[in-house]
Amino acid sequence: EQLKLGGEMKDISIMFCDVRGFTSISELYDPEGLTQLINKFLTPMTQVIMDRMGTIDKYMGDCIMAFWNAPVDVPTHVAEACNSALIMFEKLEELNLELEQEAANNNRAFLPLKIGIGLNTGSCCVGNMGSNQRFDYSILGDDVNLCSRLEGQSKGYGVDIVISETTKIAAPEFATIELDLIQVKGKTVPVRIFALLGDAQVLTSEWFKDMSAVHAELISEYREQNWGNAKALIVQARAAAGDKF
């Protein structure tokens, strides 16, 4: 009943998830095997999103675009998106163990699947979009484009999940650290980006408190271009985090 022809503006949490280095992985499979691999990847990832009240917008090869808070209202949409991203990495670890065993059984080389995720929250136009002949329920807007850009930043910064400042502010119960202030294509104002590292349990852990305190100093020295101090703080931050990430 809440579906409407055309579009409406709504506050939405958006996710882009993409497989890294998929070209190298695809070379290990024939077309049928590659299709099976994609399906094995998309199925558990989709289930996580749907279990947390997300809507799959579309699949683009090995990429998933999803959003929360439409067509059904989800008051906790920011938290649902963040939790989905974290759980997806747990499911990916399980899938890679299965794929590694399959590769060993078939005497085939194994490359683990690795993904990057971008999350953003903002006002989007959501509704039935397309032509008179065919339309899809989808979202449009600058915040959708930004989310795609955030996913692309995950590899460059060496983190799993990159989120916007808007998402970070709306989800204070999650463990995050600032990554940078970047200029994104198509935007005139620099965008502050963060890495999502964990849930409330991580946020209250001693290792995260220690690491995030050092990391805040690191960001400050980095912005002041005190490179020597920044490098020393990188070592301290890594030591505080240990093998957590």
Where are these regions (language model features)?
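Catalytic NTP-binding/metal-coordinating core of nucleotidyl cyclase/transferase enzymes
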Residues: 3-84, 137
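Catalytic strand-loop-helix junctions within cyclic-nucleotide turnover domains
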Residues: 67-77, 117-137, 154-157, 197-200
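Solenoid-repeat scaffolds in large eukaryotic assemblies
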Residues: 227-233, 237
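Helical mechanochemical/support elements of P-loop NTPase systems and associated helical scaffolds
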Residues: 8, 15, 34, 41, ...
